[in-house]
UniProtKB/Swiss-Prot annotation:
Keyword annotations of the record: ATP synthesis, Cell inner membrane, Cell membrane, CF(1), Hydrogen ion transport, Ion transport, Membrane, Transport
Topology relative to the membrane: Peripheral membrane protein
GO MF annotation terms: ATP binding; proton-transporting ATP synthase activity, rotational mechanism
Protein name stated in the entry: ATP synthase epsilon chain
Pfam families named among the record's database cross-references: ATP-synt_DE, ATP-synt_DE_N
InterPro entries referenced in this protein's UniProt entry, alphabetically: ATP_F1_dsu/esu_C_sf (IPR036794), ATP_synth_F1_dsu/esu (IPR001469), ATP_synth_F1_dsu/esu_N (IPR020546), ATP_synth_F1_esu_C (IPR020547), ATPsynth_dsu/esu_N (IPR036771)
Family in the record: Belongs to the ATPase epsilon chain family.
Organism: Shewanella sp. (strain ANA-3)
Subunit structure: F-type ATPases have 2 components, CF(1) - the catalytic core - and CF(0) - the membrane proton channel. CF(1) has five subunits: alpha(3), beta(3), gamma(1), delta(1), epsilon(1). CF(0) has three main subunits: a, b and c.
Chief location bin: membrane
Entry annotated with the keyword Transmembrane helix: no
Gene: atpC
Length: 142
């Protein structure tokens, strides 16, 4: 019996990052964590900055960082349209730590013209990248 899979396309503003059949996709939507598999009901959701984990047809996993975007689920396909997509192995941990430090420092020394929402978005993106790095480290340690 053939495995139940769905066509997944992950696309950034710059290029197509992944296209293929997958057993499942896990991503953080605007209302929380989503697990998408073959036969999922149609859905349209904003994506929060965070991790996308896919399980391929052969059972192997791949992890991506998404800075935000849109998820569309149709009966036979799933599309992720993301602002920025990075494979977990390509994330620069030191750069993410520095971005987190800068965002926290900026928030701590905020002036009258401070844009709190923009600072929170930058902090959330840096923290999401670091969570992806930590997840990969934990999986490697197993």
């Amino acid at each position: 019996m053939a495995a139940m899979t769905v066509q997944l396309d992950i696309v950034s503003a710059e290029s197509s990052i992944f296209s293929g059949r997958v057993a499942s996709l896990q991503v953080t939507g605007s209302e929380g964590e989503l697990g998408i598999m073959h036969g999922h009901a149609p859905l349209l959701s904003y994506i929060k900055p965070g991790m996308a984990r896919i399980v391929k047809q052969d059972g192997s996993e791949e992890v991506f960082y998404l800075s935000g975007g849109l998820l569309e689920v149709q009966p036979s396909s799933v599309s992720v349209l993301a602002d920025v997509v990075m494979r977990a192995k390509d994330i620069d941990e030191q750069a993410a730590l520095e971005a987190k430090r800068r965002a926290e420092a900026h928030m701590a020394t905020a002036g009258a013209d401070f844009n709190y929402d923009a600072a929170m978005v930058e902090l959330a993106k840096a923290m999401a990248q670091l969570r992806v790095v930590e997840t990969i480290k934990k999986n490697i340690a197993r």
